[in-house]
Amino acid sequence: MINFSSFYKDIADSNLQHWLETLPAILGKWQRDHKHGNLPKWEKVLNKLHYPQPDNIDFSSSVTIGTGEQLSPGQVEKLTNLLEVFQPWRKGPFSVHGIQIDTEWRSDWKWDRVKNFISPLKNRTVLDVGCGSGYHMWRMLGDGATRVVGIDPSPLFLCQFEAIKRVAGNQHPVYLLPLGIEELPPLDAFDTVFSMGVLYHRRSPIDHLLQLRDQLRVGGELVLETLVIDGDENAVLVPQDRYGKMNNVWFIPSVAALMLWLKKCEFIDIRCVDIDITSLAEQRSTHWMKNESLVDYLDPNDVSLTVEGYPAPKRAIIIATKNQPNHDLV
């Protein structure tokens, strides 16, 4: 069974120690609630991932574990088969003992867009909200973060993350907790909080921004990446039904509207540092993710539109700083 004792030990003497008052009970309930379904099968696969300490690890320019020279061809084939059990792999890519996990998303491209605008992560404690299988968490560690905590409620993402961590040696201060942000108390402790690809999935985007603020220390940095539309501060797209075949997209604001929301939530130093239209090369089907992807979500006659007729995905990166909060804002 996946356990979180190493995380509890790691934060026991940190500014996150007060989280231990509630976290073990919450994760214990999660474990009890997931005794059935696919999780037991995936955990059996995780228990087979016993490999030597990698001869090379690179988290600064990629997520590369091992050169591919330590394992025999038979061992590589076995490891490939084990990792394929965790399909679909959506966020990556990963290189594991020479095995190239070509994921649906080129998450490294997003990181390249983000990394040059954020405050240096060296010696920072970082929270990644909606972290998926953890690709960006490894890159955050590679950029010098002291501790990286990711939250995402998906059992599959947890197992994908655990697979990578175990093959990497299992000693790195990177942790994925199967939680939604609404399950976190106001920790007021993280130096940097990332929320990338989450806001438009939230029924209440203002509440999400407040939840993100509550995890930051005063002066901490929010890195927010989300879908946007063109328009002024009053422009917000609310899809009538689906957006890009997704039925869980609620609000897509303009950059101006999003910056106004952040100001309303008492962030300061708010700035948009990048706007990028998602390309068919950045999100696509692969051997490791064989389901539909971006090309299937766009109008075949006009890729500037989704199949529903909405503007095609455009993503903005907004950076802001937590101000001293006004406790009258709820």
From Swiss-Prot:
Recorded catalytic activity of this chain's protein: carboxy-S-adenosyl-L-methionine + 5-hydroxyuridine(34) in tRNA = 5-carboxymethoxyuridine(34) in tRNA + S-adenosyl-L-homocysteine + H(+)
One example of a Gene Ontology biological process annotation: tRNA wobble uridine modification
EC main group: transferase
Pfam families named in the record: Methyltransf_9 (PF08003)
Annotated Gene3D superfamilies: Vaccinia Virus protein VP39 (3.40.50.150)
Cited PANTHER family: METHYLTRANSFERASE, TRNA U34 CARBOXYMETHYLTRANSFERASE
NCBIfam families the UniProt entry points to: PRK15068.1, tRNA 5-methoxyuridine(34)/uridine 5-oxyacetic acid(34) synthase CmoB
Name this protein carries in UniProt: tRNA U34 carboxymethyltransferase
Originating species: Shewanella frigidimarina (strain NCIMB 400)
Name of the encoding gene: cmoB
